[in-house]
Amino acid sequence: MTAWNQVASNRGAAGVDGVTIQQIVGSGDDETSGLVDFLIELQKELQEKRYQPQPVRRVYIPKADGKLRPLGIPTVKDRVVQAATLLILEPIFEADFLDCSYGFRPERSAHQALEAIRANLAAGYREVYDADLQGYFDSIPHDKLMACLQMRITDRTVLKLIRMWLETPVIEETDEGPKSTRPEQGTPQGGVISPLLANIYLHWFDKCFYFTDGPAHWAKARLVRYADDFVVMARCQSPQLVDWVEKKLEDWLGLKINRNKTRIVNLSKEGTQLDFLGYQFRYDRDRFGHAWRYLNWGPSAKSLNREKAALTAMTASRFGLVPIDRLIAKINRHLKGWMNYFCLGYPYDVFQKIGHHVRSRMIRHLLRRSQRPYRFPEGSTTYRVLADLGLLNPTKVYVNSRRKPKAKVSGNAGCGKSARPV
């Protein structure tokens, strides 16, 4: 039942069978009988070893750079079985995972990874190997992943389940109709258990890094990893360190590094910066004019532009008939989630730009809601009118939160690489 509740709370789309969570719940004589029948039948399939996963439905979602990311959507039944397996396996592997790993783990977050980078920079680790793995989830070798799993899992039934999920056909809609392919490598993004499998595979990179003969010792380097995004930080990046990382990832793990996006950043040099998980790190002059002593970090320029584009889309002319209170409530919920994620470091200037942008967009929205020009009350300002309507002021929220360090912006925070920027 716990596995079902987790799947139901995510409200995912239907798989290839078209069955939704709502249809399962409402398929019986009352509100719960449909769910009970579904779970009993699924339990029988597993006990009698009749369970077979259905094909995964592939869809594509846009990425920030304009490209498309493939997303695999299993059926509700398969998601429930994966969630139940995850409940068993996650505590086992959590005992093995190292502190340098922060992504898709309980009690771990992107904020902790960012704080680790800040602490390493403050300790003098300013030369950073910023790596990019090309299509990581889709390129994990099945045999090597299964070998990693067999080191901790002895139950053949569980291993068989995972092997079946990895090799399940993927169905994709094309101009010629549905097309089915059987993957030879990778674990589909969108599967409930995929993030854990991805972490298990890269855990061996983490482990080798911190072995007694690894670069954590002979190069005095440090590793910060969030899923497949990671940086190697050192006081001095040597060719031997870079060569070790690339050989482990490509020759040993069979992954591919995107050379066009991988770079070495020396933050001690003027004009250099590190972008990680939507944040930007750079050194500026302090108030006395001393060069590169002040660590300035906060939302990156890319994150700022992405948020501006999102707010522009939310205030487009097609929403002119939406009641103003509902529109502002929607914008406020979005802003709260964005600010909750980008509250670290020194985001004041970026919050100020976001506040200016959302106010200018709302003014334009008010002016075009009617054929008659919108008239602001006499003696009032646009700033006051929008505040009276309830529009959130990001800079004001930020200043108030700094006065109360433990205070958080209320509301549902939703930001992404899910709690990681999208």
Give residue ranges: language-model regions:
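Short, solvent-exposed helix-loop connector elements
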Residues: T181-T187, N296, T312-L327, W338-V350, ...
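Extended C-terminal regions of large enzymes
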Residues: R359-R361, L366-K408
